[in-house]
A protein has these predicted regions:
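Switch/coupling sub-region of P-loop NTPases
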Residues: 1-100
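Helical/strand "switch-coupling" subdomains that flank nucleotide/phosphate-binding cores, especially
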Residues: 51-54, 83, 96-121, 125-127
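Generic alpha-helix signal with a bias toward terminal, lower-confidence helices
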Residues: 13-15, 55, 79, 111, ...
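NTP-binding/hydrolysis catalytic cores, primarily Walker-type P-loop NTPases
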Residues: 118-186
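A generic structural micro-environment signature
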Residues: 9, 21, 49, 105, ...
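Intrinsically disordered, low-complexity boundary segments flanking structured domains
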Residues: 2-5, 92-96, 105-110, 151-163, ...
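C-terminal lobe/lid and adjacent interdomain/linker elements of RecA-like ASCE P-loop ATPase modules
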Residues: 3-19, 114-131
Length: 186
């Protein structure tokens, strides 16, 4: 990236994994600095995806990274699966929630037939909050059958929440169409 040449007045610290220093050790040292931005060149392996999520959660004001997912849902799925494969999480929904919390925007670039890169779309990630909408009316029910009906209502809500794994929604806020950028969801 040659950031020292582009930003000569900035205090830039570069780290790279070696045979004797792991990427996790680099991240642990970086967390102790007062850095503002983390740039992770290529999130192509499961451990690097895990480091990126960690860095975005606690190590800086924001984190930039590259990835080759074709769609936003593919990006979330790939990062979630990396978190599961590295053993950071064992629950699919929890892993996805953590990924979604750090993905604010996806700036998706493509290359045209001439080899020129351009931004195809900018997508915003909106985490969905889990609503606690259980019905506590069973306490007021007079009969056993009425209490049982309320119990089954709450059980239905619980199992719907457990099986509906939607943790986010996403919207394209800018798209490239016919040579122009168009605001689609300002």
């Amino acid at each position: 990236l040659h950031l020292r040449k582009v930003y000569p007045t900035r205090n830039i610290l570069s780290m790279r994994e070696t045979d004797t220093i792991s990427g996790q050790e680099c991240l642990d040292v970086q967390k102790k600095t007062d850095g503002s931005v983390n740039i992770i060149g290529e999130v192509a392996t499961d451990p690097v995806a895990s480091w990126m999520i960690q860095a975005a959660q606690v190590a800086s004001k924001f984190t930039l990274f590259t990835h080759h997912a074709k769609t936003f849902p593919n990006l979330v799925t790939a990062l979630r699966n990396s978190m599961l494969r590295t053993g950071v999480f064992t629950d699919e929904k929890t892993a996805e929630e953590q990924v979604v919390q750090v993905l604010n925007f996806d700036v998706h670039q493509v290359k045209d037939f001439r080899g020129k890169r351009y931004i195809e779309r900018i997508t915003e990630c909106i985490p969905l909050e889990n609503e606690d909408n259980y019905n506590l009316d069973y306490k007021k029910a007079k009969t056993g059958d009425a209490k049982l009906d309320k119990f089954f209502d709450n059980a239905t809500i619980y199992f719907s929440k457990s099986t509906n794994l939607q943790t986010y929604k996403y919207v394209n806020i800018l798209e490239y169409h016919d040579g122009n950028y168009v605001l689609t969801n300002p």
